[in-house]
Amino acid sequence: MTFEIVFDSAREFESLIATLEKFFDEAVFQVNMEGIQMRAIDPSRVVLVDLNLPEMLFSKYSVESEEAIAFDLKRFLKVLKLARSRDTLVLRKGGENFLEVGLLGDENTWFKLPLIDANTPEIEIPSLPWTVKAVVLAGALKRAVKAAKLVSDSIYFMATPEKLTFKAEGNDSEVRTVLTMEDPGLLDLEHKMTKAKSAYGVAYLEDILRSLADADEVIIRFGFDIPLLLKYMVRDAGEVSFLIAPRVEEGRS
C-alpha cells in the first residue's frame, strides 16, 4: 500500500471536490509526506485553483513516498455523493493503477477508480500588486453576487479605506452592495491609497462560493484591473485559493 489516507467526514470532502469539479473534468493531486496539493488552471484560463490539505487534517495519513495521482473528478464526485452524514472517507493506493475509495459507516462500501496520466506542467502563482485585502463572511459575499446576477454577468469589486462595494450594471439597472466595518459581514479591510476597481464573472464566483457556509470567512485581494485572489480555510489548517482573471471593459466608469 503506497498510501492510506482517512478523512473523518466524507460529506465535507464531497463539498470540496464539488467545487473543483465545477472547473475541471479531471485533476492531478500531489500526495506527499506533508499532505495533498493540487494546482491547475481551468480550460477557459480564467481561474487558477491552488489546494493545500496538510496531513494534520486527516485522522490517518500514511504515505510511503511522494507521487502524483490523477483521476476523473466527475466519477469521484458521484461516489462521494453516496456518503451518509457520518461516513468516513478512506483513500488508498496499492500497486495497481487504481484509487480505492472507501465510504465507511453503517455499511462499508469500496470503489476502485482508474487512475489516468498524471503529467501536468508546473504552474507558478504570480505576485500581483493587490491594493485591497478584506475578510468577509461568505454569506455576505454570496448575497452580493446573487444581487449582481439580477442585472449583469459581471460584478465590480471596489474599495475605499472606509468601505467595500460590490456593483453590477445592466442596460437599464444597477445594484450596489456596500459593506463597512460596522457591518457584521465585513471582518477586516486594508486599503492602500490607490484606485481599486475590477470586474469579475458572476458565474465563476457562484461556483466557488456555493459550497461554503454563510459563516465561513473568505479572504479577498484585488486592485485595479488585476486578478482577484479569493481564499478560504479548510478546518483552520487547509487552504483553497482561487485566482480569477478580471473582465476589462472599455468605456466603463
Swiss-Prot record:
<dbReference type="InterPro" id="IPR022648">
    <property type="entry name" value="Pr_cel_nuc_antig_N"/>
</dbReference>
<dbReference type="GO" id="GO:0006272">
    <property type="term" value="P:leading strand elongation"/>
</dbReference>
<dbReference type="InterPro" id="IPR046938">
    <property type="entry name" value="DNA_clamp_sf"/>
</dbReference>
<protein>
    <recommendedName>
        <fullName>DNA polymerase sliding clamp 2</fullName>
    </recommendedName>
</protein>
<dbReference type="GO" id="GO:0003677">
    <property type="term" value="F:DNA binding"/>
</dbReference>
<comment type="function">
    <text>Sliding clamp subunit that acts as a moving platform for DNA processing. Responsible for tethering the catalytic subunit of DNA polymerase and other proteins to DNA during high-speed replication.</text>
</comment>
<dbReference type="GO" id="GO:0030337">
    <property type="term" value="F:DNA polymerase processivity factor activity"/>
</dbReference>
<keyword id="KW-0238">DNA-binding</keyword>
<dbReference type="GO" id="GO:0042802">
    <property type="term" value="F:identical protein binding"/>
</dbReference>
<dbReference type="Pfam" id="PF02747">
    <property type="entry name" value="PCNA_C"/>
</dbReference>
<keyword id="KW-0235">DNA replication</keyword>
<dbReference type="Pfam" id="PF00705">
    <property type="entry name" value="PCNA_N"/>
</dbReference>
<comment type="subunit">
    <text>Homotrimer. The subunits circularize to form a toroid; DNA passes through its center. Replication factor C (RFC) is required to load the toroid on the DNA. Interacts with TIP.</text>
</comment>
<dbReference type="InterPro" id="IPR022659">
    <property type="entry name" value="Pr_cel_nuc_antig_CS"/>
</dbReference>
<comment type="similarity">
    <text>Belongs to the PCNA family.</text>
</comment>
<dbReference type="InterPro" id="IPR000730">
    <property type="entry name" value="Pr_cel_nuc_antig"/>
</dbReference>
<dbReference type="InterPro" id="IPR022649">
    <property type="entry name" value="Pr_cel_nuc_antig_C"/>
</dbReference>
<dbReference type="GO" id="GO:0006275">
    <property type="term" value="P:regulation of DNA replication"/>
</dbReference>
